């Protein structure tokens, strides 16, 4: 796996903390653990379905990392997520650590890096990210997931993890919006320039597939997304 040393140390120290409800690797690292993709990672995502309030989870993780020599600064905090900036004790490099509350559908997988979201949960949360924000990295990861799942399957996995109504016209807008991202948004995550047109064409293919299904179901593919 393409795991930078500071990220690996951070993960090892979180696992060693022995939390009552384990934090599982999520995001791009989880997709990589399942063999879907290998790319640079801007942050570390960890997820839990434990009942503890996120404020308590963030405080517990922060203390555990501080006890092991990391410097920790807590950033934004919501009931479902927390952002921490963690400074590696050996290199002085900083890493962004994102904590998430999730409703998981499958048992965690076990890897050398510790617990990891099951493949379906890892992909579902990534499709939710594509739906919610539509970042270039989300599109890269969604295409990697398409090696294992068809378009309707990806949509269903995303729907299972959605926190708001999940409608196909909104997903379409995220897919077609990839044309507005500069190439640098893709190359920053390891995609070579020659592959970017193929990725955009794949996104258009998915959008067209959604449009065809909406027409078959009697819905207009140009309908405004639900508010």
PLM region descriptions:
Residues 1-227:
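Compositionally biased terminal segments of proteins
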């Amino acid at each position: 796996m393409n795991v930078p040393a500071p990220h690996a140390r951070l993960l090892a120290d979180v696992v060693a903390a022995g939390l009552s409800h384990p934090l599982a690797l999520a995001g791009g690292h989880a997709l990589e653990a399942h063999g879907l993709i290998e790319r640079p990672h801007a942050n570390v995502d960890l997820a839990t379905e434990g009942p503890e309030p996120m404020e308590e989870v963030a405080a517990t993780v922060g203390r555990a990392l501080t006890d092991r020599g990391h410097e920790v600064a807590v950033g934004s905090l919501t009931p479902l997520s927390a952002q921490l900036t963690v400074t590696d004790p050996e290199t002085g490099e900083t890493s962004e650590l994102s904590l998430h509350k999730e409703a998981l559908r499958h048992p965690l997988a076990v890897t050398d890096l510790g617990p990891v979201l099951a493949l379906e949960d890892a992909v579902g949360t990534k499709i939710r990210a594509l739906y919610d924000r539509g970042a270039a990295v989300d599109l890269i990861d969604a295409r990697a997931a398409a090696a294992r799942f068809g378009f309707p399957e990806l949509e269903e996995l995303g729907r299972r993890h959605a926190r708001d109504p999940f409608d196909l016209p909104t997903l379409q807008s995220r897919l077609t919006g990839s044309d507005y991202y500069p190439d640098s948004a893709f190359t920053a995550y390891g995609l070579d320039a020659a592959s970017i047109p193929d990725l955009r064409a794949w996104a258009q293919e998915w959008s067209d597939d959604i449009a065809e299904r909406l027409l078959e179901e009697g819905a207009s593919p140009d309908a405004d997304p639900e508010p």
